[in-house]
């Protein structure tokens, strides 16, 4: 059985266990809904990080000018102080390596191979694989010559930065274990380059990540963490990025005990002086918390979350993973949601939303707040006390459509879970114009949220605050809400039609009470004439 077949079989069993665990949640509906939306929301925020957090990275060098690589590896004079000018073809490399090559011959061959694989466009990865040079590269990793090892590790880094098929070909050729061994090499340059390749393998898929774990990749990472203070920034960036790839993939997640070990290393990385290290480490924490409660709990137990909240005051490339992390934590049980509040995160949201120009940051802020509002009434009150309700209403009214969508969820969660007093706070903060404007949207989920919020608000006012009924009705009519409700009765969506019909018949008919009750009890799809 191949590596791929074995891993896929194992993952299928893990998926069954994951489904079983979901049924153990105290509030299953809340968890399933929030986690579904967490998956949907993750795409936009990941666009923001762009190339900074690609699953794979190539070590590219200008092969025509012989410049330095992207990685800016340390101590280049110790290993790469010579640059051969002659480029060898794959056939020439095969011929030299097949004829009892000297170490100088090997250096020349693997340097040439590395240069060809470092081309910015269309590196010849398939050609190298098909001509049988993968095995030569694997063997080179064990040659007692640091220059040979380094050039081979660099070439392999770029091979495993390719497609899944190319990466699997390298793994099945046996690259993983020797690369992991070299990742703890005494030479920092070799160590970093080998770890870079290992991180590319782990970043490909959950199957290959699990294979790296099986080959003791986590132990190698934690060994490096023991001396992280002695390593250069470039090396630590590679370590942090490797952590993120080890935490990244789902279906299945990495084993809980592995994530527990990694979480301890992340505490140190998020406090590093280098911003790129902190950024990659925080993305790793966001992946760690993108799972069931026991996984989120690891982040809380490790002590990493207070450092994540502190990122709210830093540059937006740190704010983005911090918001994603805390939003993930808030999808957990009420205790985990409370942990987000206790960290003081709500106090940071308002100034963050006021100063940012990024719609992605605003959207993530709304998503985080909506997850907290989906908690207890005490937690809803914490959001109101932080003066975030007017901000949500303003986003619903004037934000871009993705931000409006998240704000509509937040207000819908408030309407469904808040006390009467908390629900009426929306009216006092002038929510009606924003709701009426949202009724003009075409997104079905957003319309459903808005109609549900408006209905609950009107019902709450009618039952508990009768002196505000006329004010509320007038505001709905003056802002075009009644016209929109009448139009939505023609919607192709049965749910939207039913909700619009319910609001009109219950709150905007002038018939006597008996006739009103008759309408309420009638099937909204029953259009028969009655006399």
From Swiss-Prot:
Main site of residence? cytoplasm
Q: Where is the composition biased (Basic and acidic residues)?
A: 11-20, 29-50, 515-531
Q: Where are the ARM repeats?
A: 122-161, 164-203, 250-290, 293-331, 334-374, 377-416, 420-459
Please name the InterPro entries in this protein's record.
ARM-like (IPR011989), ARM-type_fold (IPR016024), Arm_3 (IPR032413), Armadillo (IPR000225), Importin-a_IBB (IPR002652), Importin-a_IBB_sf (IPR036975), Importin_alpha (IPR024931)
Q: What happens when the gene is disrupted?
A: Embryonic lethality associated with a terminal aneuploid phenotype: embryos display severe defects in nuclear envelope formation, accumulating nucleoporins and lamin in the cytoplasm. Worms lacking both akir-1 and ima-2 show reduced gonad size and aberrant diakinesis oocyte formation; defects are caused by impaired meiotic recombination.
Protein's GO biological process:
embryo development ending in birth or egg hatching; meiotic cell cycle; meiotic sister chromatid cohesion; mitotic nuclear membrane reassembly; NLS-bearing protein import into nucleus; protein import into nucleus; regulation of chromosome segregation
Q: In which tissues is it expressed?
A: Germline tissues. Expressed exclusively in germ line cells from the early embryonic through adult stages.
Per UniProt, the keywords (alphabetical) are: Cytoplasm, Meiosis, Nucleus, Protein transport, Repeat, Transport
Q: Which residues form the IBB domain?
A: 5-67
Gene Ontology molecular-function annotations: nuclear import signal receptor activity; nuclear localization sequence binding
Q: Which residues form the signal peptide?
A: none
Q: Where is the composition biased (Polar residues)?
A: 1-10
Asked if Magnesium is a keyword of the record, the answer is: no
Q: Where is the composition biased (Acidic residues)?
A: 62-75
Q: Give the UniProt subcellular location, in the record's own words.
A: Cytoplasm; Nucleus; Nucleus envelope
Q: Where is this region: Disordered?
A: 1-88, 511-531
Q: What biological function has been recorded for the protein in this entry?
A: Nuclear transport receptor that mediates nuclear import of proteins, and which is involved in sister chromatid cohesion. Binds specifically and directly to substrates containing either a simple or bipartite nuclear localization signals (NLS) motif. Promotes docking of import substrates to the nuclear envelope. Together with akir-1 adapter, required for the import and load of cohesin complex proteins in meiotic nuclei.
| Family listed | Belongs to the importin alpha family.
* PANTHER family assigned: IMPORTIN ALPHA
What do we know about how this protein assembles, alone or with others?
Forms a complex with an importin beta subunit. Interacts with akir-1.
Tell me the protein's name: Importin subunit alpha-2
The species this protein belongs to is Caenorhabditis elegans
């Amino acid at each position: 059985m191949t590596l791929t077949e074995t891993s896929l079989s194992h993952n299928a069993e893990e998926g069954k266990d994951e489904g079983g665990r979901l049924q153990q949640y105290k509030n299953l509906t809340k968890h399933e809904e929030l986690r579904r939306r967490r998956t949907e929301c993750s795409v936009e925020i990941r666009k923001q990080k762009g190339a900074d957090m690609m699953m794979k990275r190539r070590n590219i060098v200008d092969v025509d000018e012989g410049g330095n690589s992207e990685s800016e590896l340390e101590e280049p004079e110790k290993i790469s102080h010579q640059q051969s000018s002659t480029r060898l073809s794959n056939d020439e490399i095969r011929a030299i390596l097949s004829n009892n090559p000297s170490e100088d011959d090997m250096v020349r061959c693997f340097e040439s191979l590395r240069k060809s694989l470092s081309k910015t466009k269309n590196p010849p990865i398939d050609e190298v694989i098909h001509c049988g040079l993968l095995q030569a590269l694997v063997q080179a990793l064990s040659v007692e010559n640091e220059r040979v090892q380094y050039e081979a590790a660099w070439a392999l880094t770029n091979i495993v930065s390719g497609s899944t098929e190319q990466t699997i070909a390298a793994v099945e050729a046996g690259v993983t274990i020797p690369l992991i061994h070299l990742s703890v090499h005494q030479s920092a340059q070799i160590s970093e380059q080998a770890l870079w390749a290992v991180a590319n393998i782990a970043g490909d898929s959950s199957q290959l990540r699990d294979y790296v774990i099986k080959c003791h990749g986590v132990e190698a990472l934690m060994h490096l963490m023991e001396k992280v203070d002695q390593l250069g920034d470039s090396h630590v960036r590679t370590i942090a990025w490797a952590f993120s790839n080890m935490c990244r993939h789902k279906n299945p997640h990495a084993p809980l005990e592995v994530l527990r070990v990694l979480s301890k290393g992340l505490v140190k990385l998020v406090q590093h002086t280098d911003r790129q290290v902190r950024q990659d480490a925080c993305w790793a924490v966001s992946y760690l918390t993108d799972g069931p409660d026991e996984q989120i709990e690891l982040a809380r137990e490790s002590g990493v979350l207070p450092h994540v909240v502190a990122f709210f005051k830093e540059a937006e490339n740190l704010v983005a993973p911090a918001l994603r992390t805390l939003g993930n934590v808030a999808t957990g049980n009420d205790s985990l949601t409370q942990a987000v509040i206790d960290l003081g995160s709500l106090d940071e949201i308002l100034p963050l939303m006021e100063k940012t120009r990024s719609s992605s940051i605003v959207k993530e802020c709304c998503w985080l707040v909506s997850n907290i509002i989906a908690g207890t009434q005490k937690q809803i009150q914490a959001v109101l006390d932080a003066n975030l309700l007017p901000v949500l209403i303003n986003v619903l009214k004037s934000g871009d459509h993705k931000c409006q969508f998240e704000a509509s969820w937040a207000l819908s969660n408030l309407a469904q879970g808040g006390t009467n007093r908390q629900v009426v706070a929306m009216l006092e903060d002038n929510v009606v114009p924003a709701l009426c404007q949202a009724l003009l949207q075409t997104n079905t989920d957003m319309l459903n949220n808005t109609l549900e919020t408006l209905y609950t608000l009107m019902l709450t006012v009618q039952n508990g605050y009768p002196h505000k009924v006329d004010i509320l009705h007038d505001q709905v009519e003056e802002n075009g809400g009644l016209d929109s409700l009448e139009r939505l009765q023609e919607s192709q969506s049965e749910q939207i039609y039913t909700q619009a019909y319910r609001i009109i018949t219950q709150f905007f008919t002038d018939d006597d009470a008996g006739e009103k009750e008759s309408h309420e009890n009638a099937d909204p799809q029953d259009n028969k004439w009655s006399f």
